[in-house]
Regions:
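Electrostatic interaction modules used in gene-expression and signaling proteins
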Residues: 3-202
Length: 202
């Protein structure tokens, strides 16, 4: 965690698990003038979000930079990731809020994704998982709509066990033969049974 000299002990409460301190706007702007990395981060964040940050949003962005131990480059990757995720799901024009960016920042920080190389490795792993998820969607004939949270949870669980689309297509076939439909709990029992026997997984 980096110290900035903008606040001293007792000035603001220490941040909790999902809580950033409160800064004075003039102190943030002064830091922006002196810190080229944060100034560039602020400019790019406003460009991505399409508007000048409010005082509250400015406080959030600076809090992420000041307290979570992330480099400016890492935060830029995080912001672009949040924007790309919404764009893929809803199309152009849907942009993340600073609150959503803050939540994602805490998620990364709690997993010690603090440097650009760590962020790039994490994002590459996410891309591979999304690619696998898409293959499984097609194998289970789940096209034309988004997965529900429960469906996503099942598939992520199976992928984490080492089962890809090819193996899950077999489980899907057996599920439909046994139940006449895609019964998630039934298919889950099949996959877990395989896992216990170390069958079909990678």
């Amino acid at each position: 965690v980096s110290g900035t000299g903008l606040h001293t002990a007792g000035d603001v409460p220490l941040p909790g698990p999902d809580e950033l301190p409160v800064y004075r706007t003039e102190d943030i702007l002064r830091r922006s003038a002196d810190d080229g990395a944060f100034r560039a981060l602020l400019g790019e964040c406003q460009r991505v979000l399409g508007h000048t940050l409010s005082s509250a949003d400015l406080n959030t962005l600076f809090g992420i930079y000041d307290r979570l131990g992330m480099t400016a480059e890492t935060i830029l990757l995080l912001i672009h990731h949040c924007a790309d995720k919404l764009r893929r799901r809803y199309g152009e024009g849907r942009l993340p809020t600073m609150r959503a960016i803050e939540k994602e920042a805490f998620y990364w920080a709690n997993r010690e994704i603090l440097t650009a190389p760590q962020a790039e490795e994490y994002l590459a792993a996410l891309a591979r998982r999304d690619e696998e998820m898409e293959k499984v969607r097609h194998a289970l004939s789940l096209t034309g709509r988004d997965l529900t949270p429960t469906e996503r949870k099942y598939i992520e669980s199976w992928l984490s066990m080492g089962y890809g689309a090819e193996a899950l297509a077999i489980a899907y076939d057996r599920t439909v033969v046994g139940t006449g439909k895609l019964a998630w709990a039934y298919m889950d029992k099949i996959v877990k049974s395989w896992y216990e026997k170390r069958k079909y997984n990678k």
